[in-house]
Every structure is written in C-alpha cells, then in structure tokens.
Amino acid sequence: MTIEQLIWLVPLLPFIGFVINGLGRNTLSKGLVGIIGSGVILASFIISVVIFFSLQGDTQKSHEVFLFDWISAGTLHIPLSFLVDPLSSIMLLIITGIGFLIHLYSTSYMHDDAGFGKFFSYLNLFVFFMLLLVLGSNYIVMFIGWEGVGLCSYLLIGFWYTNSAYASAAKKAFVMNRIGDLGFLLGVFLMFNFFGSVEFSKIFPQAANMLPGNNTLILITILLFIGACGKSAQLPLFTWLPDAMAGPTPVSALIHAATMVTAGIYMIARSSVLFDLAPFTQHIIAIIGAATALVAAIIALTQTDIKKVLAYSTVSQLGYMFLGLGVGAYTGSFFHVLTHAFFKALLFLGAGSVIHAMHHEQDMRHMGGLRKKLPVTFLTMMIGTIAIAGLPPFSGFFSKDEILAHAFQYSPVLWGIGVITAFLTAFYMFRMMFLTFLGKYRGTHHEESHVHESPAAMTTPLIILAVLAAIGGAINIPHVFGGNEWLAHWLAGAGVAQHELDLSHSTEYALMGTSVVAAIIALLYAYTRYVKGSRVPVADEAPRSALAKLSYNKFYLDEIYDFIITKPLDAFSRFFYRVVDTKFIDGIVNGLGWSTNEASKGIRLLQSGNVGFYIFMMVFGIVALLLYTFLYI
C-alpha cells in the first residue's frame, strides 16, 4: 500500500478506540478496554514505521494527501488534507511509539480505578488530536488538533474531578491555553489576509521570496509565538503546566513527553521559513526561552513533590528548545524534542512506579532508600537522569549541546544562561534521585515492608525508554565527533531552515566540556549534600532563606497573576453584576413590568363583573356602529 492509502489510518485508529471505549466504558471488561486502547495505538505506530521507511526510500519526500474539500467560501479554500514529510513522519513515531508505551503502562497503573474505560477513551482521543495537529497540511487543520489536545488535557488533568483542587487545575490549564490560542488564531487570520491562503504549500514559497524584517511577518510570527507560549508553557504562561500534575501520572507523561507541550515547538519548526525572516521575533523567542529555562530550573531546586520537580524540569527543557528556535537551531531544538520525549516519558513513568509502590505518596521527604526495593525503577530512572543532565554519551548530551553551541554563536550571554541552567538541571535531578532512592527510608517500618517493584506492564516501558534515552543521541551525532548529522539532513527535506555552526572544533569541544563539567560539579554537590550529608528538605512551614523562599513559592507568579489579573477582573465582574446588571438592566425589565402592572390596575376597573352592564355596553356598541354606518358611509 502507498503512503496515500496508509496515512489516514494513523489518526483513524485512535479515534475508533476512543469511540469503542467511550461507548463501552461501563460494559467492556478492563482487559478488553486495555487491549483496544493500547492496540489501536500500537497499530498506528506500526503503520507510522512503514510510512517512515517508505518515505526514506522515496525520491519525493513530501506527500500532500487530500481527503475532501472542507470549507470553500469566496477566496477561502480549506481542504482536510494531510502532509506527510520528514518532519511529520518523525512526530508520528514519537506520538504513537511513546503513546503506546504509556497506554501499556496505564493498563496496570490505572487498573483499580473506577473510570478505567473513560480514561482510555480520553487517552485515545488525545493521541488522535495530536496526530491531526502534526499531519495537517494547513494552519486550520493544525488548529483543530491544537484545540483538541487542549480539550483532552482539560479532561485528563481533571480526571479525578471530585477533588476540587484537581478540577481547578484542569480549568486553569484550559483558560491559560486559551490566552495563547487567541494569539495563534489571530496570527492565522493575519496570514490569510496577507498571503491569501492558510496552506503551507502556498504560504511558504511566497514567504521565501520576501526580504527579512517585513513588519507584517514580524507581527504574524509574534502572534504564532504567543500561541506556542501557551501550549508549550513559556513565560508568562507556564504556570498551568506544574498544576497539570493533578492528573494521573500516565497523563503527565503523555502531556510532557509525547503530545501537548511539544506542539508549540513543532508549529514553529514547521513555520521556520516565516520565523527565519523575522529576526526581531527570533530574538524575543531566544530571550524568553532562556529566561523560562532559568526560572523553572530555580523553582525546581526546592520542590519536594517528585512530580512537581519533573514538571518544572519540563518547563525548563522547553525553554532550552525555544532558546534553540530563537537562535536558529531548528534542528537542534527538534532533536531535543526527540531526546526529551525519551527521557521525560521515562522519568514520569518511573515516578509513577515510585508513587505506585509508595501507595500514592509523592513527597520525597517521606521516601529514601528505595533503590533495593525498586531496582528496575531505580536503574532506568538513573539513566533518564543522566540523559537530562547532559552527560555523555547519553542522548540529552548531544541535543542540549547542539542548542548551546548555536546559542554561543548567537550570544555568549544566552549561552551563559544555558550553562547555568545545565548546572541547576543536573543538581535538582540528582537531588530528586538521591532523596528518593538513596539513604535510609524515612517512613515507618510497616510502610517499608509493603514497598515492592511494579509489575511487568509498568517496568517494560521503563526499560524500553531507558534504552532509547541512552542511545537516542545517535540519530544526530555532530560532525565534531565524526557523525553525519542524519536528523539535520532528514529535516532539510521538510523545508526546516538549516543554520550551520561557524565554530572551530576546539571551540565546540570547549563548550561541551564546560557544560559537562558544570553537570558533574552539580552531581557531586548533590551527592555531598543529600547522600553524605543526609540532608532532607525542611518542612513546608519551616523558615527558609529569601532565595529558597522565592524558589519554593515559584517566584509568587500565581499570586502576582491573582493580584493584577484575577482580583481586578473579579472586582469588575462584581461591579458589573451589582450596578449594570442588577440595577440598570434589571431596572429596565422590572420597570416595564411595574408600569404594565400599574396600567392594568386602571383598566381592570372597567371589568365590573356585572353581566347586565356587559349586555348594555354590547348593545350600545352595536347601535353606535349602525348609526355611524348609516350617517357617514
């Protein structure tokens, strides 16, 4: 079968799984729900692999598959069509491959949950919309997938909606994403007005003939970037992502590794032709990316919830990716999307294994000494930690250092922020590992006796992801190490902008050495502090230094937003309700009712209830009409 015949099955199968599990959530057995939910994603992955290898052997690297003409009004023509090229083919493998491992993991992790069928139907729908997002051949189809993953994140973050805090976290994610989505939508409208189309195949060739610095292009790219900030959790719109930990742990893994948060990176990489012509926008992206990476890393330093540490690490790593996009390292950023998907899915699922073993305890202050109890979880998570810390030869080393090298070429200041962030990343990640797995168990002996390794359905995905986190960097080994940068050549076939490094090998080695040394120093400091020194984070109410307090309270960003946005809007809405709605609008409506009522009281006096009087008036009226007829007509 050809690519054109196969591609529509990739998103269709998860949608079928959503329908079957959604309709049969209360009637199908949990075993059957798990088989259907995981099976459709596995089938999509297998088809994606076939498409990927077919594309490799094809001289034509881009296939636009038309399904049907969806909207046609005047000059606006929007077909429902898919674009299969090197960029989307890699995303298909990430979404379906890691998505399948998360589904498999969930069959065990969520087995005792009453909403098992509903959970799998939501997961399938999430994957469907993400596939629609990356396959769309125009910005409208992409936007449908974009909004769909936002809806599914709301459903999954608030899956345990009976807990009011979890329900609030879901609403927060939904609302903050809508802010970014408005920017994306305005950017699409402006694009249609400027280019006369929303199709990639028509916009990008026109843009390629334009000179850099066009004001309209700058405005379009800024609006698109605002959309990416919301979906991919960048300053100032990142505070929803840590709260998304309210959902079940497999949801966290899916959102943070394989789907939602990578959408903004993908959209900018897909639109790299436009962003390359807007250097002002790129500069903003680089600054915000670097700032987000640093701020989130500082916040992660003092968190005690194992999932919150990983959540802020995701925000920080996304900041790295945006830094790369801003300095023109589109391939490096996408490379980091790929490696991050491996080690972040591994770390979240590993954290889920710990939480499962600890009977839903997430506070690292109550853990410790779990290495012997959870050997597979410990070993696999350690591989993921080494990868995210950027130590060679694990995957994160290659992708992170490619971004840092481009950052150095663009601005040594941004590179310096990146290196500081690398140091902090290694410190808080090894801090998490040491507090969780080394030292002595900080709970009771009775609790410790019930800690055990997770079942095979949960550990198998960990092992697979650990292998990928260890060797995944091989996909784009740089020339300085004798590699051929396969990924860069592959993405060039999708029109992703390429910017070569203009650095000597000695400079590249020095830059890599600096970041590696920073990570090793951070590792040793964390070991000295939390293993040799047996330090445990202080209780929530204990006094902290000013910087630690700032970090622990997340720079008070939620409180600031509450003060400058939420409270004024709340006060305005109360004023509007009490004055405009209650007194003015209700006054008009109620005043009309009162006037009608008072007028009816006077008219009511004519209704005496005397039948004789009614007959008299009827006769009088008839006589009057007859006289009028004879006299005047």
Question: How does the language model describe each region?
Answer:
Residues 61-76, 201-210, 399-406, 479-505:
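Membrane-interfacial helical/loop segments at transmembrane boundaries in membrane proteins
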Residues 77-95, 214-228, 417-421, 499-522:
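Hydrophobic alpha-helical transmembrane segments
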Residues 344, 423-432, 518-538:
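Hydrophobic alpha-helical membrane-embedded segments
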Residues 1-6, 23-121, 194-214, 218, ...:
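Transmembrane helix-loop-helix hairpins at membrane boundaries of multipass inner-membrane proteins
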Residues 11-26, 100, 229:
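N-terminal signal-anchor/start-transfer transmembrane helix
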Residues 75, 83, 478-514, 528-633:
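Aromatic-capped, Gly/Pro-kinked transmembrane alpha-helices
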Residues 101-145, 151-450, 454-457, 468, ...:
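Hydrophobic transmembrane alpha-helices and their helix-loop junctions in integral membrane proteins
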